[in-house]
């Protein structure tokens, strides 16, 4: 296990902990991901950047040496995404948490709106939109506050855990299920939303999602479709 030096003042907790997970991510994409966090209007003490390297063939820290003073790096044997995120949760000291996949990145201009909602309204959770294009319109709209139950009565669930900036106090021991192949996000985010008593949502597209033909959501083989349906059924009936 490798750790970079964490220079954060231990006397005060950061506002947001960003949990970046990576496994054999392209070097340029991983650096762009880290840089997108560092460009935000958060001081060094207001942010915590945790990179969980889930068994990459070559240590991801090798391409992040320029950022060692800005992040905490942990390398572990490959245990899949859920375990990597759970590791990040256990380490995070921030009041709020944000998951970022290592090949994606935050869209600065619109993510700032989400940070403003946190600063001025102290919500339990901010729900924002994802984009497959790096060019997005500015947005400063929002709805809320409402409870998670009220939100779910009028909206469909968006499973991806990267679409939420949420207060750590919502977790109450909640973690990602490690036995599922596909529906771990849906189970986690549904419970997270239902725990929320002070939820805000915005149309701001604040997260760039890189589509891959090999990703779980794009697997077309009957076996993979069946596994996803089985996992989804278990989540619904749980």
Name the predicted role of every residue range:
Residues 1-230:
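Nucleotide-sugar donor-binding/catalytic module of glycosyltransferases
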Residues 230-238:
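Amphipathic alpha-helices of TPR/Sel1-like and other helical repeat/solenoid scaffolds
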